[in-house]
Amino acid sequence: MIEPADDVAQPSPAADAHPTAEPVVPRHAAAAGRRGKQRSASVSFLRETVIILVSALVLSLIVKTFLVQAFFIPSASMHDTLIENDRILVSKLSPGPFDLHRGDIVVFKDPGGWLPAPVETERGPIGTAVRDTLTYVGLYPDDAGEHLVKRLIGLPGDHVTCAGAGKKLTVNGAPLDEPYLAPGAQPCETAFDTVVPPESMWVMGDNRQHSADSRFHQGEPGGGSVPLKNVVGKAFVIVWPADHWQLLRNPGATFADVPDPS
């Protein structure tokens, strides 16, 4: 009789007689578990999406309030530098950390009486609410009808003159060559002579014959000059339409020979 080797597995009568079965999970319980996991993933995704959107809106509001704001160009007063429907970005660091300079393109709030009452466009309550919200946080260009864009010609104390049609502007006695003027535009059509008051600026459009600028408000308080406190910032780039994208550089050579006011 041969004895079984020690290393040969022996069958277990008890195990063979009573095999152990895997626990059976009901189908409805498994499905419920899957649905629970899916709901948890959906809630997590929704929460992360809301956090991202809120963070983006807060960041946009901070940027608009302290750094950059978008504006829409509605008129031809700055041709050919800016044309209708251009979207520009304006740096709110000037004035502020950075000074304004003669030749800068500036956006400023209407000092009073420069603009007609805005015409409301029919958008419906939802469209109006969406537009106002996006404008408030800086994701939509401001076209509220209370801002203007012009070129800064004179700073506080500057003596700005023009002898009439066909004559050049002078600032503190220095004549200006203005390459940014619209084709065919003259530096001025009528004579004027002004000294810019303290904390103010003298502004003119590049399309002089189609710009109701400082020249046309000389009979008002400030003599046509705009308070510097009204300045929103300096335009520095056209961002839309894409084929008109360009940086808006200061024409430094135009004002290079202008002396400080005496």
PLM segments and residue spans:
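Soluble "head" domains of membrane/secretory-pathway proteins
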Residues: 2-44, 62, 66, 71-72, ...
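Alpha-helical transmembrane segments
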Residues: 46-53, 195
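Hydrophobic membrane-insertion alpha-helices, especially the h-region
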Residues: 50-66
